[in-house]
A protein has these predicted regions:
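Short S/T/G/P-rich N-terminal loop/turn motif that feeds into the first structured element of a domain
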Residues: 1-47, 53-67, 74-116
């Protein structure tokens, strides 16, 4: 069952978030089961919303890759997140994601065909 992961990452600036995302090499090595990643800036934190194929896939990414990456960027607060079942995902214009310039999805050739 598809799920949504919600996470607030305190102590993380957008600059360090961008560095961490580059270091994770998600374009070249996407985590199994990942569908969509959205990040926003909040006061003193970055908020993340992700859609995953399963809760197990989301938890595996957090435990095997994300925790170490956050530690490498001096995030000391314990990571907290919640996972909820996905009820609906509506995306009427997938091509807009690459046009707004906030996406790494377009870097993956197999994703371009999904937006066509």
């Amino acid at each position: 069952m598809a799920v949504v992961l919600f996470m607030r990452v305190p102590e993380l600036s957008l600059e360090r978030y961008d560095l961490m995302m580059a270091e994770l090499e998600l374009d070249a090595n996407p985590p199994p089961g990942a569908i969509l990643h959205i990040a926003t800036e909040a006061v003193g934190s970055v908020n993340v919303c992700e859609v995953w194929q399963t809760a197990e896939a989301a938890e595996s990414f957090v435990e095997r890759r994300l925790r170490d990456a956050l530690a490498g960027h001096r995030v000391k607060e314990p990571l907290s997140y919640r996972i909820e079942p996905l009820h609906n995902l509506f995306a009427p214009d997938l091509e807009m994601i690459s046009r707004i310039g906030a996406s790494s999805v377009a870097a993956l050739p197999h994703h371009r065909s999904l937006a066509s």
